[in-house]
UniProtKB/Swiss-Prot annotation:
Family annotation (PANTHER family): PROTEIN ADENYLYLTRANSFERASE SELO, MITOCHONDRIAL (PTHR32057:SF14)
Disulfide bond positions: none
Requisite cofactors: Mg(2+); Mn(2+)
EC assignment: 2.7.7.-, 2.7.7.108
Catalytic function, reaction form: L-seryl-[protein] + ATP = 3-O-(5'-adenylyl)-L-seryl-[protein] + diphosphate; L-threonyl-[protein] + ATP = 3-O-(5'-adenylyl)-L-threonyl-[protein] + diphosphate; L-tyrosyl-[protein] + ATP = O-(5'-adenylyl)-L-tyrosyl-[protein] + diphosphate; L-histidyl-[protein] + UTP = N(tele)-(5'-uridylyl)-L-histidyl-[protein] + diphosphate
Keywords: ATP-binding, Magnesium, Manganese, Metal-binding, Nucleotide-binding, Nucleotidyltransferase, Transferase
Function: Nucleotidyltransferase involved in the post-translational modification of proteins. It can catalyze the addition of adenosine monophosphate (AMP) or uridine monophosphate (UMP) to a protein, resulting in modifications known as AMPylation and UMPylation.
Main enzyme class: transferase
Protein name (database record): Protein nucleotidyltransferase YdiU
Stated family: Belongs to the SELO family.
Length: 490
C-alpha cells in the first residue's frame, strides 16, 4: 500500500487497494480531460461525512478533480473489468465510461470508492464514447439520494459537473460527469469475469479482498467463502425486500448491476411505481418485462445463482460437494426475502408482531389495490394519516370490509394506537421521487435552473416527515404515468 498523503485544505485522502489485485481485473486509465468543467451540484453533507471540506470543493482545483482534468495525490485511476448477464445473455463488460479514482479514507477509517461516471473512453468502452449526458447524471443524483432518505442501501452521489462539451445521443445533449460514491464497485459480474478469464488464484485473490473489504469480522472460519456466499445472499434478500416495500423498480437487474456490498447500484432506467401492479415496467429496453416489479425477487435469486457458480472452485475441493453447498445456500434466499418483506409489510400496517393470518390480510389489501388501480404510496399514506381521498379504492365495499378486519387486528395487539401509528409513519414514505416530478426537475436543470431540483431533493431527504411542505409532492400526476418510459442514457 502506498503512503497516503492528505491534501489538508480539502481533506482528500485517497488510496487504491483494488489496484493491488491481479492486473487482469482492471486497466490503468486516466480520465479524459474536458473543455470547460463547471460544478452544478455538490452534496455537502456527504462530502463532510467523507472528511472533505465542502467550502473548498468549489475551487477550480477540486472542480478539475470532479471533471477528471486533475489527478489528486494518492489516486491511481483504473477502469474495472467485469463480465456478466444482460437480460440473460453473457457479455464481456467492464467500466466503459467510468474511472475509479481510488478509495477515500474517511475520518472513521472506512475506505469508500470515489468513481467518475462519464469520464471518457476506457479499454472496455466497446465502441461507446465514454461520456454521459447531464439529464441521466442528475437523475442518478436525485434517485440515489432519495434512496438514502428512504434508508435503503445505495451508492451515493457527491457531485455533478458539466463538461462544456456536447454528447451525441438521439439529440445533442449537454455533457456531464457524476462523482459516484460506493462501499465498493465489486459486482456479481466482477466475480463472473474472474471465474471466466482468470485463474483460480486470481479468483481467490478477488474473494479474499472482498471479504477483507466488506466482511472483515470473519475470523478463523474453516471456509470463509461459504460465509461470503451466505452474507451476499442475506444482503440481497434484505435489499430487494426494501425495494418492493416502497415500489422501487430498478429496471436493469443485470449481474453487473448487483453489488456484492448489498447497495443499490446503477440508476439508469429505474423509477418508482405509481399504480400498484406487479407487472409494472418502465425501462424502454425491457420489452418482455424481465425486470418488472414483481419479477425483481426471482431475478435477484437468479443473479445470486450466477454468483454462487463463480465460487464453486472455492467452496470445496470436490465439485459435486461444492454444487451441493451452493444449492443449499441459494435455497434459503426465498424464505429470507419473504421474511424481510413480510416484516416490512406488517410494519406498514402498524402491526408489531406477526400472526398467522397477517399475510392474508396483506394479500387482500394488495388485491383490491390492484383491482381499483390504487396508487401504492398514497394508499399507505392514507392508512397512516387515517385520511381517505376520493380514490376509487376507498369508496369500495371491499375496502370497507378489509378496513374492519385491519382495525380488529390492531385492537388485538397490546401496543397502543399511538405506537402503531408511529410505526406506520416510520414505515410508509409520504413522498417518493414521482416520475413526473423528477422530469420537471431535470427539464428545469437542463435550462440552467436548479431550484426545482434542489426543492425536490430537500423533500426527498426526509420522506417520512409527514410535514405540510411535503404535501404538494405527494400529489399524483394529472395524467396517468402508465406509458412513462425510462432510458439508460448510454
Amino acid at each position: 500500500m502506498q503512503d497516503i498523503k492528505i491534501k489538508s485544505e480539502t481533506g482528500w485522502k485517497l488510496d487504491n487497494t483494488y489496484a493491488d489485485l491481479p492486473k487482469t481485473l482492471f486497466s490503468k486509465q486516466n480520465p479524459t480531460p474536458v473543455k470547460a468543467p463547471k460544478l452544478v451540484v455538490l452534496n455537502q453533507p456527504l462530502a463532510e461525512s467523507l472528511g472533505l471540506k465542502a467550502e473548498f470543493l468549489h475551487d477550480s482545483d477540486n472542480v478539475a478533480i470532479f471533471a477528471g482534468n486533475k489527478i489528486e495525490e494518492g489516486s491511481l485511476p483504473i477502469a474495472q473489468a467485469y463480465a456478466g448477464h444482460q437480460f440473460g445473455y453473457f457479455n464481456m463488460l467492464g467500466d466503459g465510461r467510468a474511472i475509479l479514482l481510488g478509495e477515500q479514507i474517511t475520518p472513521s477509517g472506512e475506505k469508500i470508492d470515489i468513481q467518475l461516471k462519464g469520464s471518457g473512453r476506457t479499454p472496455y468502452s466497446r465502441g461507446g464514447d465514454g461520456r454521459a449526458a447531464l439529464g441521466p447524471m442528475l437523475r442518478e443524483y436525485i434517485i440515489s439520494e432519495a434512496m438514502q432518505g428512504l434508508e435503503i442501501p445505495t451508492t451515493r452521489s457527491l457531485a455533478v459537473v458539466t463538461t462544456g462539451e456536447p454528447v451525441i445521443r438521439e439529440n445533442v445533449l449537454s455533457g456531464a460527469i457524476l462523482t459516484r460514491v460506493a462501499s465498493s464497485h465489486i459486482r456479481v459480474a466482477t466475480f463472473q469475469y474472474a471465474a471466466k478469464w482468470g485463474t483460480i488464484e486470481e479468483l481467490k485473490a478477488l474473494a479474499d479482498y472482498t471479504i477483507k473489504r466488506h466482511f472483515s469480522d470473519i475470523d478463523n472460519l474453516e471456509n470463509p467463502y461459504i460465509f461470503l456466499l451466505q452474507e451476499v445472499i442475506k444482503r440481497q434478500a434484505s435489499l430487494i425486500s426494501k425495494w418492493q416495500l416502497v415500489g422501487f423498480i430498478h429496471g436493469v437487474m443485470n449481474t453487473d448491476n448487483m453489488a456484492i456490498s448489498g447497495e443499490t447500484i446503477d440508476y439508469g432506467p429505474c423509477a418508482f411505481m405509481d399504480t400498484y401492479d406487479l407487472e409494472t415496467v418502465f425501462s424502454s429496453i425491457d420489452r418482455e418485462g424481465r425486470y418488472s416489479y414483481g419479477n425483481q425477487p426471482p431475478i435477484a435469486e437468479w443473479n445470486l445463482a450466477r454468483f454462487a457458480e463463480t465460487l464453486l472452485p472455492l467452496l470445496h475441493n470436490n465439485h459435486e460437494k461444492s454444487v451441493e453447498i451452493a444449492q443449499n445456500e441459494l435455497s434459503k434466499f426465498a424464505d429470507l426475502y419473504h421474511d424481510n418483506w413480510l416484516r416490512g409489510m406488517i410494519s406498514k400496517l402498524g402491526i408489531f408482531n406477526k400472526e398467522s393470518q397477517d399475510e392474508a390480510l396483506i394479500e387482500n389489501l394488495l388485491s383490491i389495490m390492484y383491482k381499483y388501480k390504487a396508487d401504492y404510496t398514497n394508499t399507505f399514506s392514507a392508512l397512516t394519516l387515517d385520511k381517505y381521498s376520493d380514490m376509487e379504492l376507498f369508496k369500495s365495499k371491499e375496502f370497507d370490509k378489509w378496513h374492519e378486519l385491519w382495525n380488529a387486528r390492531l385492537n388485538r395487539q397490546k401496543e397502543s394506537k399511538e405506537s402503531s401509528n408511529m410505526l406506520m409513519k416510520n414505515s410508509n414514505p409520504y413522498v417518493i421521487p414521482r416520475n413526473y416530478r423528477v422530469e420537471e426537475a431535470l427539464a428545469a436543470a437542463e435550462e440552467g435552473d436548479y431550484t426545482v431540483m434542489n426543492k425536490l431533493l430537500h423533500v426527498l431527504c426526509n420522506p417520512y416527515a409527514y410535514s405540510d411542505n411535503q404535501s404538494e409532492y405527494e400529489k399524483l400526476p394529472q395524467k396517468s404515468c402508465g406509458s412513462y418510459r425510462t432510458y439508460c442514457g448510454t
